[in-house]
Amino acid sequence: RDRLRSRGLGDVYKRQPHTSNWDLFIGKLFYGAIGRKTSFMMKKEWFFFPLGLIFKAVGGIPVNRGRKSSLVDQMTEKFANSKHFHLAITPEGTRKANPNWKKGFYYIALKAQVPIMLIGIDYPSKTISSTKAVMPTGDIEKDMREIKLYFKNFKGKNPENFDLGNI
């Protein structure tokens, strides 16, 4: 029998590898299974009718990637003004191989003073693991190395689309 198993627990959720559109749905099922209502950021181009209504209903936050205002400040404000706010981020910024991860998730967690919960999806074993949290120290190189090392053993649906870059 094929079953999806989860291990562990733990307010920025960093989910990887992100190699397929299915990752969103699997992630939402996982968060529901652990009793977390999470928000996620997605490029605004996906928020057209009727998909936009669906994405917003399940926690989607449209992001204008060309806008100059600080997304870090916007998300930090959401943390400050919410009793419970959980944000899931896939820092590759795309479903294609990208060794240059976006670092916004790190700066959001640092500024909001919340832990980064590391959540790995492993398609071959049908497992989602959430067994590690990283509290940002301000030493981004050290912290990013620790984060990337956690994800090295996870395989996405399309493993060729996941690149850890230099560890």
Regions found by a protein language model. Name each.
Residues 11-67, 123, 127, 132-134:
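Catalytic core of membrane glycerolipid acyltransferases/transacylases, capturing the structured
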Residues 68-167:
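Non-catalytic C-terminal accessory region of glycerolipid acyltransferases
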